[in-house]
Amino acid sequence: MEKEGVKNYLVLVVDIDDDIGRKAGLNTPILGREENIKALIKLGLADPGDSDVNAILGGVKIYDELKASGKDVEIATISGDVDVESEKCALRIKEQIDFLLYLYNPDFIYLVSDGKEDEMILKYLESKNIFVWKKRVIVKQSETLESTYYLIQEFIKKTMEEYIPLILTFIGFSLILYAIFADIGWRIVVGIIGLYILSEGVGVRKLLMEKIKKKEEFDVGRVFPISASISIFILIIGLIYSLSSINKTSSTLTEFIGEFLLHFVDSLTLSLLILMVGKFVDTIINSEKDLLEILKKYFFCLICIFISRELIISGGEYLLKKISFIMFVMCVIIYISIVIILSVILFTKSSKEDKFKKLKNSITKG
């Protein structure tokens, strides 16, 4: 029972990947200062380099400081599961938090962790009308080669995991673009990398992501109508240019259409690209979807545009009798197969992933 005028404090140490259970064989929640010290000693003996040891020490330090200042404070350590994105992990974290809230009824919580992935529970705590302080404990290392290697290893493990899907997706699309379009594929890849580096250099990407996270309004209007107008203008210019460039001596309608397609295809491709870029910018600004999902969708659209270009060129060359019918049919089959395979790979989601996302959303919403 909370005394009148007395505020309850809880120091909550989070080990979301359950190093305490897997390495030290301990069950959570671990309650009280003495039990937490015993736990960190046992975990430290099992793995002296584990960052959760320092997280628990950081929690004990905060506990002692609050106790010394006369606060009514408790300390507890909770853990999740080695598969941090699993339903089991989310349920374990939620159950332990609910138990601690019932047991201690805290007004203030100090959330202590060794990495940002442990802070997935922050929104859940804030939804309970509890003021939360975040404290991230980072291990200090000496400037030796082994320490540098250790820091790099931990950085990759703790930080880069969220970027690996994005990096692998980009590499995969780069290889596909090169395989289909040869030299022009590398130009596209280099252009995308250049745009990304430029956005990083001038701070556009950081500003954009901050505004998206804060759901702030942008000072600019929608880009898609402007890009649509430019695309229509390019199509009209391309149409006029293509008609004026066709050889007047074309003897048959098929030859006329073939030449028209070969002259018009670049204007059509450019207009579609501008249209796609405008839609992409609007989606990034206004959509609440995951960034990786948006990038996959528009990378796929980019490949479809260039595959359509190759098909139109093949059709024009066939009409002009530059390639055989068999070669044209093979091109159509190959490119359509690529589109089907890519769509299956990119947009087929597992039921496990869907369940986890629903569970995670329910936790963050309280």
UniProtKB/Swiss-Prot annotation:
The record, for InterPro entries, names: DUF373
Primary localization class, coarse: membrane
* Superkingdom of source: Archaea
Name the record gives this protein: Uncharacterized protein MJ1032
| Cystines in this chain | none
Entry-linked PANTHER family: DUF373 FAMILY PROTEIN, HYPOTHETICAL MEMBRANE PROTEIN, CONSERVED, DUF373 FAMILY
Q: Which UniProt keywords apply?
A: Cell membrane, Membrane, Transmembrane, Transmembrane helix
Q: Which Pfam families match?
A: DUF373 (PF04123)
Single GO cellular component term: plasma membrane
Transmembrane regions? 164-184, 188-208, 223-243, 256-276, 299-319, 325-345
Annotated membrane topology is: Multi-pass membrane protein
Similarity annotation: To A.fulgidus AF2058.
User: What subcellular compartments does it reside in?
Assistant: Cell membrane
Keyword Transmembrane helix listed? The answer is yes
